[in-house]
Amino acid sequence: NNDDSTFMVTDKVYDRAMPLDINDKGQVFEPKDVGAQDINYSYLDKLFTEAIENNPISQDSLDKIEVMDNYVIQHFRIAFGNRIVAHMKKFVPVFVACGGTEVDGVDYFIARKILRKFEQLNVAYIRDEIDGFVKFLNDEFGEGKMAECIEYLLRLKNIHNGKKVIIK
């Protein structure tokens, strides 16, 4: 919950949850009529365990994340801890098992669990660092591969520049 009456969600809540941001209005559609499907906890837990075993996050990605962590510490004075990395090691394999790619899972996770901490900073102070960070992400992970992170960073920068930004 983050609305007009709740100005901030604590780190503890974010660290234990996976936020879903709904920034755009959905398209109207007619859903297909499908029957209910019961899934109990043990079955879902089994699927998660299989996903983690079959799709572990690569050492290459973990190395890039460590380099990124050091960059963020140096330029923004924000660090993320072992709990975040442990959560990422569970989230990304499940993301891959659901049909996504590893880099897209890392991108989604970082944008929602790490970069959201930038909102707590004085954006006037960090605004000049954002372009360098976007370049770093493109250099480290591949041009345009960290699209969620880059979109978030540019939106943050432009909102505080007084510009309205529309990113497609």
Regions from the PLM with identified roles:
Residues 1-168:
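C-terminal regulatory/interaction module of P-loop NTP-utilizing enzymes
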